[in-house]
From Swiss-Prot:
This is Uncharacterized protein C12orf56. Residues 157-238 are annotated as: Disordered. It comes from Homo sapiens. InterPro entries: DUF4551. The gene is C12orf56. Pfam families: DUF4551. PANTHER family: RGD1561648.
Amino acid sequence: MASPLPSGFPARRNSRLDVFLRRHLPPEVYDAVRAYEPCIVVSNSENHILKYVVLSDRLVYLTENPPKSIRRVVALRDVVAIDLIDDYPEFLSSPDREISQHIRIIYSSTVLKKECKKSNSVRKFLFPFHHTKANNKKVKEEKNGLAFWRSKESRSLKESPLRDQQESSTPSKDSTLCPRPGLKKLSLHGQGAFRPLPSPSRRSSQSAPTTGKAVSEPSCTTNTKEPQGLPDHNSISEIPFKCNGNGNEFYLGNSLLDSPSQSNSNLEKKESELHLYVISTTSSIFLHLKSSWNNYIIKATLLQDPFYASEFSPAIGSQKPYRSEEKIKHFSQLKSELFLKDNSLRRILSLLMELKVAAQKNFILKRLFWKTSDLFYFIVNKLHEYLPESRDKNALQNQSQRVDELVACIEIIQTLVLMFRETETESSRLNTLAAKKGALFNLLVILISEPQIPKSCPVFDIQLVADSALVRMSFDAELQKLILEYTNTATALLYEILLVFQQGNLGLGSTKFAISWIMSFLQSCPPIITFVASIVKQVVRGLSASFQLLSPCQAVLLYQQFYILKSCLRHSRTLAEYIRNNYREEFRYFIHMPALQKRLPLCYPITQPTIQLFHEVLKLVE
């Protein structure tokens, strides 16, 4: 079987299919299409038929070749596993067998049993975490995710069974941070902006520090509506769900009408498989499927935070018809204003936060961000002015000014995290990263370096000493919080960059931008030791400080930290030896599975991937 090593990630190649999708999908759904690929489809309803598989941010579609109609087949929230099967399909000719990729998508849903289909009661059910692997198959890629509960609105017999091919027009909540109401030090008038901080009332980029206050009973309510495809008369009505304190069970709605045994007896889990046979050695659809599923898991976990979900919900009555032209015009205006000379840091931050908020709801702005490289270079150069130390000599003595600079830099890095997320199919992003490697090098050094903060100036007057001591303590505490938040934000962005290198090369050859290459570069940078040490110490504090449950943002951060540690252990001999020699005892006594299970609620979609990643890290440390 062929190995999927693409030379790039072309998202769209077929003009006829592209025109068809543009005509038959709503504009916001069309703009969210990540990739498509011709393949032979085998499923319960398809038997070795050549079709196009179309991947969006939430759904997998199928359409004929040539296209005539399009229908949804799998929602990413229902996926249990996406595997690359090492076999030789007998129905293919001998040459095609050698270059084929066999992709298996296992998905599940919780449905009412036949005798209970007409029941409309609200019930409790167990969350389906595990699946049974197919026998006698050699799986090349193991599952690394979690089964999402799927339910679609049950239809009455009088309702029309026509297919609904449109996704919900609710803006996508694909944010990369957990927001807080406003900026403490840098107020931006007229902006709906927020800068997360690691204290209990603040949020950090995709995660609050594990040392902060955790939620004891995190809500697991999802507010997003999954776009509907074929009506499913066997499914339960889609009702927001919550998990109880132990994180193992879900309750539909706000009442429990039956006992667990009665409710579960009326439910059954249905598991299905979708097999895609791609006749190509360069197809990247498998990587796209895995990446989109991983992105969805992170997004779904963050949406378990009610505050996070409410902040990015559109205001009632504020929704307008989606028009790509308006988004393009808005982006062009923001970009032109960013490039104006003599812009203050406050003004640049205001514009970037406006761009971030818009990109959270409209994927097309992410695509426009990477269409040309100038905006990425502009942001990296702007970060380099203030990190790891400020070029403004006044900031070396002025703590207040340095606080403002760090606030701005954290927000700027969060914007980059957002732009990296879900854009793995954009070849322009890969071209940008490859065109000027110096910008990428500078960004990596910035991320792993601890920001420099000013030293306190001596004061000789007794009263001034007392007053300045209080002020200094206040600024010192704020700076330490910002340093921790910066590390968490940098962790999120480094995770996204590592994914780029893990998913394939940048079109310049298989070795120039491989994961081993970036790890080799990082281990040559002296700050990496301190950065890795800070990650390990945060994990230790997070898992040993208390047994309160992690918040959704903290859970996402923990996953990203484990991913970075795994990359260091697997692809860098120097960093692997450092971790084993200096933190073996921590992994033995503090970083262990019982501690992880007590802190990580089962109701988070990212829990199962984190547990699997944790097992891999432990094996590499041994």
